[in-house]
């Protein structure tokens, strides 16, 4: 597998990005990222750990993010059972972050991206301090070099957004005191509150989910979506990091879209003997097939897609790139 984390620009992609920057958006010529050092990061997820670690060893991103700690039913932080100390020891401690997400276990269920637990924890300074202390203790316990906060759906509630900004300000001070790095993941819709967030923080903006399980068929990102989100990310008071997602989805008329890795998408192409087409506006691949029961439509991002997306960001100075995710991208030779 070719490296998708690369600071070397492909000439063709650079030329394409330059042409687009001039012609596709009236304000593109004015768009410029703040000064920043280059960085590459990839997420390693607990449900695909071995493949993720293997790809991390091949790709060698500068930063690795372990996904993820979440909330027990009582509101305390826990690691998935699959993430043992032995697993975590496979990663270089000096480049690994632990991600924290607002998923909470409730009996046999897991509430995904739940804001109820956040409203309780972030509402008052004392509860924020306790939450921060628990975050730092968990990172110290497993020798992580940094903290990643990935709390989603906060943009839906203005009061929660205000408390989140206070939480990040306080967390920034505590992580600095403990010699821990900090990055904060933001959904594109959260960028409307960019000016309310504290400075001196790395903000990882999700440049994906344009299409997905919530919509009909299409790419995770396209040129217009990337340009628009870059223009919003440039307003952040901290250092923006651009996060792209590989893989894709399989849609049918009767079921919710199913998430696919690149390996799974290519396997479907081979099984049903179909050739994908590459979309001009996103450079994503797409194809359709019939499994004998119903028609399917698949869109996914491959290496060429990711390189194109990165070039769009790098052309205007965004040099910190994260990839969701490592694992499921190794194609048979």
Each model region followed by its residue ranges:
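Bacterial N-terminal signal peptides
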Residues: 13-22
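Glycan-recognition patch characteristic of GH18 chitinases/ENGases
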Residues: 29-131
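Substrate-binding surface in catalytic domains of secreted glycosidases
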Residues: 41-43, 73-82, 162-271
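Short, acidic/polar
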Residues: 45-58, 125-140, 187-194, 302-312
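Conserved, mostly hydrophobic/aromatic
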Residues: 64, 149, 203, 242, ...
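Glycan-binding loop/region signatures in secreted carbohydrate-active enzymes
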Residues: 99-117, 246-309
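Active-site groove signature of glycoside hydrolases
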Residues: 132-161, 207-209
